């Protein structure tokens, strides 16, 4: 039954974001659930990415004798070219790596971090409430010091088999020679155009030639990104944080500081001091399986474990063809989300009760409430060992998401 739960949960995660309401045309992009299948699985390795070009690059690396990490680096670099709106080099991420020989599960945290000049109230209104999403994300204070390149470099140094430069070649060729932009990329450029890009002549020159997104039927080239990738291939990941590329990044941030005097800017120490964090995986036993995922500050892993644990308390899951199954799944996700939004934060700000939130007694009480409560939005629970909520319960507001 657990395999069925995982399958149903995966189907739901891939489809519900597009169905969520209300939706603005300027929201962060959602999934394309109607897209036809573009790949099949065979052999002893599977590659799954958001773009077939990235998947093909990863498969080619594996066929050339590369490790899974080599394939990962190649795929992520290609995504930076073909999906810059979602997977650019200036972002961040988490990585789980299983070393079968050592029987060791490793979690690396390469998420963005706030610069040293940040203050706790940078993105708050005078009332103490968070700024609206659109206003907050338009401010330079919302830009975090990127971790993607450091994450890829660190894991490649540990588990890579092919030369670092070799893994970046497919991305360099695509950026230099061009590719036909996907509907997702063109749609994201259109959203940015509606929101406003007057502050970035570079964006307009690259993504809005003649005032319009790149045509879908002609190759789109990004020579500047090709040069960036070539520098990374030649000088390695650290050059992004301490070399020529770091100087370019700091110059760009200084330009933002000139346009917005209240922005305190970045210093060389912000980039030079960036470090990937190694964390312990978050694991939970469910039936005969031990399920492991990424711990906080990621909140999605805990939510998935809670959702599965809640569903495991029900006997009403008869299969994907039954609407009741989907209703229960949606409710379980909503209840897990209530805990996620309240309890999960940056571990630097204090302990997070991940164990109590997965405690069997607590899960059982939440499952009973889930099945007996009306369909109103659930509130966060109080897990065992805690006498009171540490801060006020959140207002019911719609969460702004990002690319699935």
Language-model-detected regions and their locations in the chain:
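Noncatalytic scaffold domains of N-terminal-nucleophile
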Residues: 21-56, 60, 68-236, 240-242, ...
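Internal mixed beta-strand/loop scaffold within catalytic domains of large alpha/beta enzymes
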Residues: 63-75, 106, 391-404
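Internal maturation/activation junctions in enzymes
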Residues: 264, 316-404
């Amino acid at each position: 039954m657990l395999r069925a739960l995982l399958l149903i949960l995966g189907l739901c995660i891939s489809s519900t974001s597009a169905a969520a309401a209300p939706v603005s045309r300027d929201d962060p992009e959602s999934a394309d659930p109607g897209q036809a299948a573009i790949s099949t699985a065979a052999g002893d390795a599977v590659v799954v990415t958001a773009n077939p070009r990235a998947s093909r690059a990863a498969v080619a690396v594996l066929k050339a004798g590369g490790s899974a990490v080599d394939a990962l680096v190649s795929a992520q670099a290609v995504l930076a070219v073909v999906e810059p709106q979602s997977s650019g080099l200036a972002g961040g991420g988490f990585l789980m790596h299983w070393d079968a020989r050592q029987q060791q599960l490793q979690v690396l945290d390469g998420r963005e971090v706030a610069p040293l000049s940040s203050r706790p109230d940078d993105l708050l209104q005078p009332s103490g409430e968070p700024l609206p999403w659109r206003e907050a994300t338009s401010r330079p204070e919302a830009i975090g010091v990127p971790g993607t390149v450091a994450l890829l470099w660190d894991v490649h140094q540990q588990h890579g088999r092919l030369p670092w430069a070799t893994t970046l070649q497919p991305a360099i060729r695509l950026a230099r020679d061009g590719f036909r932009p996907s509907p997702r990329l063109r749609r994201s450029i259109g959203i940015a155009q509606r929101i406003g890009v007057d502050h970035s002549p570079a964006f307009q020159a690259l993504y809005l030639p003649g005032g319009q997104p790149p045509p879908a039927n002609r190759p789109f080239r990004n020579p500047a990104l090709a040069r960036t990738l070539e520098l990374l291939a030649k000088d390695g990941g650290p050059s992004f944080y301490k070399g020529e590329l770091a100087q370019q990044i700091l110059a760009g941030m200084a330009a933002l500081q000139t346009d917005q005097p209240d922005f305190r800017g970045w210093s060389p120490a912000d980039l030079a001091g960036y470090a990937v964090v190694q964390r312990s995986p978050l694991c939970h036993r469910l039936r005969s399986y031990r399920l492991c995922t990424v711990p906080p500050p990621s909140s999605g892993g805990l939510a998935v474990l809670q959702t599965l644990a809640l569903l495991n308390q029900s006997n009403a899951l008869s299969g994907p063809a039954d609407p009741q199954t989907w209703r229960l799944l949606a409710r379980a996700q909503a209840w897990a989300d209530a805990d996620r939004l309240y309890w999960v934060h940056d571990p630097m700000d204090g302990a997070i009760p991940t164990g109590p939130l997965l405690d069997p007694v607590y899960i059982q009480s939440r499952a009973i409430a889930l099945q007996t409560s009306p369909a109103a939005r659930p509130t966060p629970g109080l897990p065992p060992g805690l006498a009171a909520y540490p801060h006020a319960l959140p207002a019911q507001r719609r969460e702004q998401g990002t690319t699935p």
